[in-house]
C-alpha cells in the first residue's frame, strides 16, 4: 500500500481495471467446491461495471451466487462484508443476505476530499481550466457518495476547511438522515495522508459522534 501511494505521489501513470470474467468465474468455481453458496459484494454499479458483469455471470450458477447491488464502495463496502458475515452467522441464506443488504443500501454516506485535482481532471470530472484555477487558489473539492452517484458536495479553500466540512456533513447526516438508526451506524475512515494527520481527524470524527 505504501509503495502504491509513493508511486502515486511520484506522478506515475496508474489506472484501474475490473477483473476479467474468466478470473471471476475461476474464483467462484473454486469456492463452490467447498461452499454451497457465495455472496458477491462488488463495488457500486454506478461507479464500476464490475457489478453488472458479476450479475450477468451469476445467471449461469443456478442462484448459488448472489450478487449484491447495494451501491457501496470503500469503507461502506467493507462494512457490507461484516454485515454479511453477521447475517450468515444468524443463519440467513445467501439470497436472504442479498435482500437485507440491498434493502439497507441507502443507509450509508461517504465524503471524500483530495489533495490534488489531477485525477479528477484526468477522469473528466472537472475541466483542465477548473483544475488549474483550483490548484492556484488551493481549492479542495469535497465529494459525496450516497447511493450510486459521486457528486460534488462543496468547494472550500485549504485542507483544514475540507476536513471541517466533512465532519460537519457527518454530524448533519447523523442528526437528520440517520436519526432513526443513529445508534446502529458505524464510522469508518480511509486515507492516503500521513498517519498523524488522519489520527487527529479520526479523533475529531469520534468526538463528533459521541457529542450527538
Task: Give the positions of each predicted feature.
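Mixed-charge interfacial surface used for oligomerization/domain docking
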Residues: 1, 37, 46-66, 72-204
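N-terminal glycine-rich anion-binding loop in soluble enzyme alpha/beta folds
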Residues: 1-23
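Alpha-helix boundary/capping residues
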Residues: 8-12, 31, 104, 124
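Single conserved hydrophobic/aromatic residue that forms the stacking wall/gate
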Residues: 202-205, 209-212
Amino acid at each position: 500500500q505504501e509503495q502504491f501511494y509513493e508511486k502515486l505521489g511520484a506522478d506515475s501513470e496508474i489506472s484501474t481495471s475490473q477483473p476479467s470474467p474468466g478470473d471471476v468465474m475461476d474464483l467462484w468455481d473454486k469456492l463452490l467446491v467447498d461452499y454451497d453458496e457465495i455472496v458477491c459484494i462488488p463495488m457500486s454499479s454506478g461507479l464500476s461495471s464490475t457489478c453488472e458483469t458479476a450479475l450477468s455471470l451469476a445467471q449461469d450458477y443456478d442462484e448459488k451466487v448472489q450478487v449484491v447491488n447495494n451501491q457501496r464502495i470503500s469503507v461502506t463496502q467493507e462494512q457490507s462484508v461484516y454485515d454479511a458475515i453477521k447475517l450468515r452467522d444468524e443463519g440467513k441464506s445467501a439470497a436472504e443476505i442479498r435482500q437485507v443488504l440491498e434493502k439497507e443500501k441507502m443507509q450509508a454516506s461517504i465524503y471524500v476530499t483530495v489533495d490534488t485535482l489531477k485525477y479528477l481532471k484526468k477522469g473528466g470530472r472537472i475541466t483542465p481550466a477548473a483544475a488549474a484555477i483550483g490548484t492556484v487558489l488551493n481549492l479542495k473539492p469535497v465529494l459525496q457518495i450516497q447511493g450510486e452517484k459521486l457528486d460534488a458536495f462543496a468547494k472550500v479553500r485549504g485542507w483544514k476547511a475540507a476536513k471541517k466540512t466533512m465532519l460537519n456533513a457527518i454530524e448533519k447526516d447523523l442528526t437528520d438522515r440517520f436519526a432513526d438508526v443513529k445508534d446502529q451506524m458505524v464510522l469508518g475512515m480511509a486515507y492516503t495522508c500521513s498517519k498523524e494527520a488522519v489520527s487527529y481527524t479520526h479523533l475529531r470524527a469520534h468526538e463528533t459522534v459521541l457529542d450527538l
